[in-house]
């Protein structure tokens, strides 16, 4: 559960990302594919090379979903319901992959925004990504 301080930290950190969210999403996906090669199996139709238009487009989708979640911190299950259905029923993504992407997102954000990435912000973003992952895997049961 995100505390009021966590919510403030998440909103502040995401605002710092600003118009770079799509680029950061794509970079996090690239990190995930390189660090955890088994995640590539969910994207057999993608060109997974560095700078790929398909990875950039999917990175923007990831970033847009996270922006939506940040805008609905008090109702993430409602805001992400359709995305949860998609990943659980159609795409059948193994839930562990959300943790892997969350880690790669944290690394990407820390590398681009070191001044804003304090220990408190790191902890709040980690809790936020865990909450998003929980929502996205809630329809698996």
UniProtKB/Swiss-Prot annotation:
Positions where Phosphoserine occurs in the chain: 3, 35, 49, 102, 124, 138
Sites where the protein binds heme b: 87
PTM-bearing positions, type Phosphothreonine: 8, 108, 134, 137
GO term, biological process aspect, one: hydrogen peroxide catabolic process
Gene3D superfamilies tied to this protein: Globins
Top-level lineage group: Eukaryota
Domain Globin: 1-141
Tissue-specific expression: Red blood cells.
Sequence positions that bind O2: 58
One GO CC term on file: blood microparticle
UniProt KW keywords: Heme, Iron, Metal-binding, Oxygen transport, Phosphoprotein, Transport
PROSITE patterns: GLOBIN (PS01033)
Modified residues (N6-succinyllysine): 7, 11, 40
Molecular-function GO terms, alphabetical: haptoglobin binding; heme binding; iron ion binding; organic acid binding; oxygen binding; oxygen carrier activity; peroxidase activity
InterPro entries recorded: Globin, Globin-like_sf, Globin/Proto, Hemoglobin_a-typ, Hemoglobin_oxygen_transport, Hemoglobin_pi
Main function: Involved in oxygen transport from the lung to the various peripheral tissues.
Protein family: Belongs to the globin family.
Quaternary data: Heterotetramer of two alpha chains and two beta chains.
PANTHER family: HEMOGLOBIN FAMILY MEMBER (PTHR11442), HEMOGLOBIN SUBUNIT ALPHA (PTHR11442:SF48)
Protein name, as recorded: Hemoglobin subunit alpha
Organism: Eulemur fulvus fulvus (Brown lemur)
Lineage of the species this protein comes from: Eukaryota, Metazoa, Chordata, Craniata, Vertebrata
Gene name as annotated: HBA
